[in-house]
Amino acid sequence: MITEPRLLLTVGEPAGIGPDICLQLAFHALPSGVLLIGDLHCLRSRALTLGLSLRLEPWLEGNPWPALERGVLHVLDVPLAQPCRPGRLDMANAPAVLATLDKAMHLLRAGAADALVTAPVHKGIINDAGIPFTGHTEYLAAACGSPKVVMLLAGRGLRVALATTHLPLAQVAAAVTQEGLEGTLRILHRALREDFALSEPRILVAGLNPHAGEGGHLGHEEQDVIAPVIAALQGESLRISGPWPADTLFTPRLLEDADAVLAMYHDQGLPVLKYHAFGEAVNITLGLPIVRTSVDHGTALDIAGTGRAEGGSLLRALDNAAEIVRNRRAAGC
């Protein structure tokens, strides 16, 4: 019987630092067995470019799960259409990048793996290839048939979830609705209990407008949308407070008594999180039937293949994925 979490790791955009940070794993203590999904030739070529001495072993579906072995990584080969060069995007390879996610979903559905960790992809080149793509979060939600998911970034004791994700700022206010906000808070509360083993999680909710609307003088979303949802959930004994002015919420006095923050939009919450824990933070998708974590950074094309990429966030993403699998098992999920 397999007891240790079985982790899948998609390599991401092959021209970026995804291959670099994945290869670094061969020299680190990992939380459990990891299977890479990507182009085997690309990984071998990048290892040569970086001067890394390791073994890359092909893995076929149906094989025993890879054992932990220092200096060895196992790869489920998903070939690229064109050879990969560090730092140079190629639209022809965009379908293969998405194929790694599809292959991972196949293994998860089959019960052959327990969690998915993703290295960064390049949204622009995928869209340039004629494939509509907003991001990992939305792609995996569609693949899982999950009507609503929540993006959470966590690092150095701070957890920040988002009420809206990849939207132009001009569209945010209209996207913050009572129904959507209630769903987001319920997903966040459940994840804090089941994935992070917090029995009574405490959540701080940010306002949308400066000064949380200043009593309606700087916007009505706090009074009309956010506060009623908070009050309703408080009536169910959930430990949720707000709406707080965002510049007040992100201060030590309030954060020390909180398990998570809900920000209304991407650039309200994530700049603080990344300033606090960049390179150590983990992106976690809540509301999926699978466990999915990712790094807190992008493809960094400018340093791909140079040896300057740091894999700290990826190591923490693997640790977090394994921890969530264990916590869900303990909770009977």
Curated annotation (Swiss-Prot):
Residues holding a divalent metal cation: H166, H211, H266
Q: Which InterPro entries match?
A: PdxA, PdxA_fam
Q: Which reaction does it catalyse?
A: 4-(phosphooxy)-L-threonine + NAD(+) = 3-amino-2-oxopropyl phosphate + CO2 + NADH
Please, what other remarks does the record include?
The active site is located at the dimer interface.
Give the protein's cofactors: Zn(2+); Mg(2+); Co(2+)
Molecular function, one GO term:
cobalt ion binding
Entry protein name: 4-hydroxythreonine-4-phosphate dehydrogenase
Summarize subunit and interaction data from the UniProt record for this chain: Homodimer.
What is its biological role?
Catalyzes the NAD(P)-dependent oxidation of 4-(phosphooxy)-L-threonine (HTP) into 2-amino-3-oxo-4-(phosphooxy)butyric acid which spontaneously decarboxylates to form 3-amino-2-oxopropyl phosphate (AHAP).
Q: Does the keyword NAD apply?
A: yes
One GO BP on record is:
pyridoxine biosynthetic process
Family that this chain belongs to: Belongs to the PdxA family.
Query: What residue intervals traverse the membrane?
Result: none
Residues that, per the record, bind substrate:
H136, T137, K274, N283, R292
Keyword terms, alphabetized: Cobalt, Cytoplasm, Magnesium, Metal-binding, NAD, NADP, Oxidoreductase, Pyridoxine biosynthesis, Zinc
What GO cellular component term, any one, is given? cytoplasm
User: In which domain of life is the source organism classified?
Assistant: Bacteria
Please give the chief subcellular localization of this protein: cytoplasm
Lineage start: Bacteria, Pseudomonadati, Pseudomonadota, Acidithiobacillia, Acidithiobacillales
Q: Which organism is it from?
A: Acidithiobacillus ferrooxidans (strain ATCC 23270 / DSM 14882 / CIP 104768 / NCIMB 8455) (Ferrobacillus ferrooxidans (strain ATCC 23270))
EC number(s) reported in the record: 1.1.1.262
| Pathway the protein contributes to | Cofactor biosynthesis; pyridoxine 5'-phosphate biosynthesis; pyridoxine 5'-phosphate from D-erythrose 4-phosphate: step 4/5
Tell me where in or outside the cell this protein is found: Cytoplasm
Q: Indicate whether Coiled coil appears among the record's keywords.
A: no
Binding note for cofactor? Binds 1 divalent metal cation per subunit. Can use ions such as Zn(2+), Mg(2+) or Co(2+).
